[in-house]
C-alpha cells in the first residue's frame, strides 16, 4: 500500500523542512510520497519543496493560474499515485505523528479517517473564544443543514485520510476551505471513523482565516444542500405548511358556523391541519426517506408541531417584552418555529 500525503501550500516555506522531517519519521517503513500543491507563493514555497525533494520523496506542483485550498487538494488527488490519500496543512497545526493512526484506521476497514478535534481525546490549543465559537457554530450549521454528516463531530477538519476510491470519478467543486465536507456529501464510502488529535499552535507564518471565509462556508453549505435535494425539501415543506394554514382556517370557519364555540373549534381545526401537513409531507416532501411505521412518524410529527408552537410562543412573548410590534413579533416566531419544525422532522421523523 502506498500513501500520498497531499499538502496545499501558500507562503509556508519556513515550515517545510520541519514538516517533511516529521512526516518522514512518522512514516518510516511505509511506501509514501509527499505531494505539495503550491499556489505560486510569493515566498517561493514551491522552490523550497523542490530543494527538499533530493532528501524526501516529494512531488511539487506549482499552480500559477488556479488559487484556493480546496482546488489544490483536488489537484493533489489527480497527481497522487498512492492507494491512500492523506490531506493536511503545512503550518504544523496538524501533527504528522497522527498520520499512522489515520492510516491504521483505513487498514482496519474505514473508507475515511478524520483527524478530529471534537471527539474524546481531541482538543484545540490556545484558540481565543471567538475562534472556538466560529468553529463550533460552523459545525452545528453544517450538521443541521446536511443530515448525511449529522453524526460526524468534526466534518470541517482539514486533516484526514481516505481510500483513493472514495473520490475516484467524483466531481468535486467546493467553495472555500472545507474540502472534507464536499467529500463526505459526494464521496463513495460506507464507513467513517474519527481519530482524536490536538490541533496545535501555528509554528510560523500567518493564518489564512479571513472575513470572507464564513460567507464562503455558507455558500458551500447551500450548494451542497441543493446537490442533496435539501433545498427542494424545504420548498415542499413550506408549500405543505401554507396548505395547512388554509385547512386550519377553513375548518375553524366551518366549525364556528356549525355552532361550536370559537374557544373549542380551534382544537380540531389545528389537529386537522397537522394531519393534513403530515399526510402531504409523508407522501411528497419526504416520500423517498420514510422509515418505520406510519404511526411512529405521526407521533414524532406531532411532537415537532408542539415544539414549533412552544418556540413561536416563547419568541413572541420575548419580543413583545422588548417592545417589538406584536405582528412583527409573531412573524419572527413563525419563521423560527418553521425552522425548528423542519429540523426536527428532517432529523427525527424522517431521519435517514
UniProtKB/Swiss-Prot annotation:
Pathway entry: Protein modification; protein glycosylation
GO annotation, biological process: dolichol phosphate mannose biosynthetic process; dolichol-linked oligosaccharide biosynthetic process; GPI anchor biosynthetic process; polysaccharide biosynthetic process; protein O-linked mannosylation
Segments passing through the bilayer: 230-256, 262-286, 294-320, 326-350
Cofactor binding description: Binds 1 divalent metal cation.
Membrane topology (Extracellular): 257-261, 321-325
Membrane topology, as annotated: Multi-pass membrane protein
Pfam family, one: Glycos_transf_2
Catalytic activity annotation: a di-trans,poly-cis-dolichyl phosphate + GDP-alpha-D-mannose = a di-trans,poly-cis-dolichyl beta-D-mannosyl phosphate + GDP
Positions annotated to bind Mn(2+): 91, 93
Name by which UniProt lists this protein: Dolichol-phosphate mannosyltransferase
Organism name: Pyrococcus furiosus (strain ATCC 43587 / DSM 3638 / JCM 8422 / Vc1)
Amino acid at each position: 500500500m502506498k500513501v500520498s500525503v497531499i499538502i496545499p501550500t501558500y507562503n509556508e516555506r519556513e515550515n517545510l523542512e520541519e514538516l517533511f522531517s516529521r512526516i518522514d519519521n512518522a512514516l518510516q517503513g511505509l511506501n509514501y510520497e509527499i505531494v505539495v500543491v503550491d499556489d505560486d507563493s510569493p515566498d517561493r514555497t514551491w522552490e523550497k519543496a523542490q530543494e527538499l525533494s533530493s532528501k524526501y520523496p516529494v512531488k511539487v506542483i506549482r499552480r500559477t493560474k488556479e488559487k484556493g485550498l480546496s482546488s489544490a487538494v483536488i489537484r493533489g488527488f489527480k497527481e497522487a499515485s498512492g492507494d491512500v490519500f492523506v490531506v493536511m496543512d503545512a503550518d504544523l497545526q496538524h501533527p504528522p505523528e497522527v498520520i499512522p493512526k489515520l492510516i491504521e484506521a483505513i487498514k482496519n476497514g474505514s473508507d475515511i479517517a478524520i483527524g478530529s478535534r471534537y471527539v474524546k481525546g481531541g482538543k484545540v490549543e490556545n484558540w481565543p473564544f471567538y475562534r472556538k465559537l466560529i468553529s463550533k457554530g460552523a459545525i452545528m450549521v453544517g450538521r443541521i443543514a446536511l443530515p448525511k454528516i449529522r453524526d460526524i463531530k468534526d466534518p470541517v477538519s482539514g486533516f484526514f485520510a481516505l481510500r483513493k476510491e472514495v473520490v475516484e470519478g467524483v466531481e468535486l467543486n467546493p467553495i472555500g476551505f472545507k474540502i472534507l465536507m464536499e467529500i463526505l456529501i459526494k464521496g463513495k464510502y460506507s464507513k467513517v471513523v474519527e481519530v482524536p488529535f490536538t490541533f496545535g499552535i501555528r509554528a510560523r507564518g500567518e493564518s489564512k482565516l479571513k472575513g470572507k471565509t464564513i460567507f464562503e462556508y455558507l455558500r458551500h453549505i447551500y450548494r451542497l444542500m441543493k446537490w442533496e435535494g435539501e433545498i427542494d425539501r424545504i420548498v415542499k415543506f413550506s408549500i405543505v405548511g401554507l396548505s395547512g394554514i388554509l385547512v386550519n382556517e377553513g375548518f375553524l370557519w366551518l366549525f364556528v358556523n356549525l355552532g361550536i364555540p370559537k374557544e373549542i373549534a380551534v382544537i380540531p381545526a389545528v389537529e386537522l391541519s397537522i394531519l393534513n401537513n403530515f399526510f402531504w409531507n409523508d407522501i411528497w416532501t419526504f416520500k423517498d426517506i420514510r422509515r418505520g411505521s406510519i404511526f411512529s412518524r405521526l407521533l414524532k410529527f406531532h411532537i415537532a408541531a408542539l415544539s414549533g408552537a412552544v418556540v413561536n410562543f416563547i419568541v413572541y412573548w420575548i419580543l413583545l417584552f422588548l417592545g417589538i410590534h406584536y405582528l412583527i413579533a409573531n412573524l419572527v416566531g413563525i419563521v423560527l418555529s418553521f425552522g425548528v419544525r423542519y429540523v426536527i422532522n428532517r432529523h427525527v421523523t424522517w431521519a435517514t
